[in-house]
């Protein structure tokens, strides 16, 4: 079983069948915020692989002896996007437009749980507009849930992963990666894995060939880190 950060939902659901076709192994995914999955792993959830939205949570698990030695790899870098859902009347083409009166509700994943939420707020602070708009923010448990605020008409603008809204319609504004710390999508194999060979194959799949092609398709920046 693969614990995967919420931003990876669409990409992993696309690459899952490709991995199965190549290896004969059927991957089962559990998607949630990186912090929530880390907590589940600390409480002995039966995962084989953890694909996180940062490296810090894997550092934490590594220090506690919960990762298989030498199994970590940065497989991509995530891109934050501002999404104006179809039907939203907010005239937003760039982040600075969020200060306009037409933007009443902005959905963001909780920064203490989701690296993408933390990165979004970092970008807004970098632009000097966070203090002007923070009273309009509503916080979701993860970026999938933040997206749902917009899809249901309960938010005028949403900060989420570019990968989740690339094909969602509306207006998608990728946030300049220079405005926030790199989002190193990092995978590792759990020391408690009952299927370490299959886990190694999945992590390897993310680093080459068809796996990397899917990540590229969903707008991830392909990492040269390992």
Question: What is each PLM-predicted segment?
Answer:
Residues 1-31, 35-45, 52-68, 73-78, ...:
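Exported/periplasmic ABC-transporter solute-binding proteins
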């Amino acid at each position: 079983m693969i614990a995967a950060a919420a931003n990876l939902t669409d990409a992993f659901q696309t690459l899952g069948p490709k991995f199965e076709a190549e290896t004969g192994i059927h991957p089962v995914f559990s998607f949630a915020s990186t912090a929530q999955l880390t907590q589940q792993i600390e409480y002995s959830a039966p995962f084989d692989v953890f694909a996180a939205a940062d490296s810090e949570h894997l550092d934490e698990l590594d220090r506690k002896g919960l990762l298989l030695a030498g199994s970590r790899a940065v497989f991509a870098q995530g891109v934050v996007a501002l999404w104006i859902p179809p039907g939203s009347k907010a005239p937003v083409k760039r982040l600075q437009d969020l200060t306009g009166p037409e933007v009443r509700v902005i959905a963001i994943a909780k920064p203490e749980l989701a690296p993408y939420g933390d990165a979004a707020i970092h970008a807004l602070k970098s632009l000097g507009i966070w203090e002007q708009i923070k009273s309009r923010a509503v916080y979701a448990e993860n970026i999938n849930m933040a997206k749902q605020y917009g899809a249901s008409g309960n938010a005028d603008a949403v900060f989420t992963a570019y990968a989740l809204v690339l094909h969602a319609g509306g207006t998608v504004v990728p946030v300049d990666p220079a405005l926030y710390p790199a989002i190193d999508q990092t995978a590792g194999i759990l020391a408690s894995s009952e299927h370490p060979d299959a886990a190694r194959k999945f992590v390897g799949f993310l680093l080459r060939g068809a796996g990397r092609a899917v990540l590229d398709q969903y707008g991830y920046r392909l990492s040269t880190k390992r």
